[in-house]
Amino acid sequence: MDSRTKALCDFLNAAHSVYHAQAYLAETLKNAGYTRLYEQDEWALAPGGKYFLTRGGSALVAFRVPQGSPKGFLMSASHSDRPTFKVKENFELAAAYTRMAVERYGGMLISPWLDRPLSVAGRVTVETEAGVETKLLDIDRDLLLIPNVAIHMNRQANEGYKWNPAVDTLPLVGGAGAAGKLPALLEKEAGGKILGHDLYLYIRQKASVWGVDEEYISSAALDDLECAWSCTQGFLKGGDSASIPVLCVFDSEEVGSVSPQGAGSSLLEDTLGRICDGLKLNRGRMLAQSFLVSADNAHAVHPNHPEYADPGNAPVMGGGLVIKYNANLSYCTDSVSAAVFRKICGRAGVKVQTYHNRADLPGGSTLGRISLAHVSVPTVDIGLAQLAMHSCYETAAVSDAIDLETATAAYYGSTLEATESGFSIL
């Protein structure tokens, strides 16, 4: 297995929640020599400095300051959350069996969650003498399972059965004697009295590289941890640029991005403003020279159902990076931003392909459109082609993740200068 693919798998296998994903990326940046900043502190930025900050335990922004006078911001945005089940505040349901009360987070495919080992991960807030403290928590063993109903009892199971999340998707914890044991286990793992929690279910199956040529990768949360990791690696490997490279990994994309740590928040806008203030730069002039790559996975043409794809814009796994288009601006790509990205990919030797929704199958929106309300710069929406988006176990091509790392390294090593009719790419 290629070392870059192994590193991606290691990340996927550790990122059992949005909080664990952020912590892993923060540690990766710290190990690469980046200094952590805190929003409540004064910032002392210096030429050649490498910095990162987090918000809400689940979003991250990193940036580098060039030695010379900066010409603008080169930004990428991805997200670290995934559709899953969130554990309710009072979660124990005790009767003949002990079950867990959960609710859906995001728009998921429900059926793949059933009949497979699950556990819980996220963060808990525990009581301390001075106040409260937030800790990561991951019960790293097979703990729960959502059982299916036998075909003998549900004859419609294979005929378009409609799931009721209040009934069908409650995880089994144990028998009647298990009542009270899971809350006690969580407090034991947390090391104190839990006053609040943000806990989510995750599947126990590890990331897998497979296929006759080992060309595919399957894992939980490829949408969008695959882009988050590849953009981070490209950011770290990018060469010197006269622009300021900025890496953004947001939370809450799967539920509309409206949170203090989502793309719809002030996080990116606040960070860019503080960079400009700290370096005595004109914010308007900097944004006029800036560019954003919004990286969120795309639908590959399905091998069994090609009819769901637009005939002329149907990306395949392993076919290169996907540029996403939409006439109603669900994606922010236009002719200029697409051309800039194509040019950078061409220089890096990376293939690109295109995606449009089929005209009668409208799709969703993503990070770029939402962040533009706060930071209005030319934006290209891209992604990696994948199958089974929003399943708990998704599939993509190994080569595409490597291509995104290569392309973002080339992007972050470039300098973009706005011209009267386009961009100069140095």
Q: Locations of the language-model features?
A:
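N-terminal hydrophobic/helix-forming segments and targeting peptides
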Residues: M1-L426
